[in-house]
Amino acid sequence: MARTGRRPGQTQTREGILAAARNQFAERGYGGATIRGIAAEAGVNPALVHHFFGSKDQVFVAALNLPFNPSVLVDSIVEGPRDQIGRRIVRLFLGLWQHSETRAPFLALLRSVANSPEVAQQLRTFMETAVLAKVAAALNLPTLRLTAAASQMMGLAMVRYVLAAEPMASASDDEVADLIAPVIQHYFDA
């Protein structure tokens, strides 16, 4: 008789869901993958995917080992005085790169995006829907402005952390924030 109900072993079940999610995201991209599809491939009920991860965004973050929670990221950007958004974004971004446990996945992701159109498409779709569109809606701004700000931050990451170009690579976070925050703020002041 076939077993019904929950699979034994939380860790095995969670890892099985993550493996299925990686396959679904690889085959269908972020936009085409669904919780139901991930659950079907993992052989579990969709409710179990929600139990472990909460949302498709969170499954994606876990599957790609992204070192941030998109909901927390959005809240951190939109909460607080609007005239300080540029500084908040730069500080938040620099903070994510300070620790090896978050820096390593970011470096791997940046290098993967540069070499894999599939990974680039998945990350782009995820960022557009899970971060940029939500920030744009919360602040009543055109998405183009958020995309421009994101491009500045990606450029900063490439120069400071991937290329390690001096003097940007060794500048203090305060120096970088003082230099870059006004540029980012410009996109939010329209």
Segments and roles (model prediction):
Residues 56, 67, 85, 101, ...:
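Hydrophobic/aromatic residues within well-ordered alpha-helical segments
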Residues 47:
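Key DNA-contact positions within bacterial/archaeal DNA-binding proteins
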Residues 93, 106-113, 149-153, 157:
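Short alpha-helical scaffolding segments that buttress acidic/His motifs in well-ordered protein cores
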Residues 97-128:
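Amphipathic alpha-helical segments used for helix-helix packing
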Residues 86, 90, 103-106:
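A general structural signal for well-ordered alpha-helical segments in protein cores
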Residues 1-44, 54-58:
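Basic, helix-initiating cap at the start of DNA-binding domains
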Residues 61-89:
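Amphipathic alpha-helical linker/stalk segments
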Residues 120-125, 135-187:
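Hydrophobic/aromatic-rich alpha-helical bundle segments in the mid-to-C-terminal region
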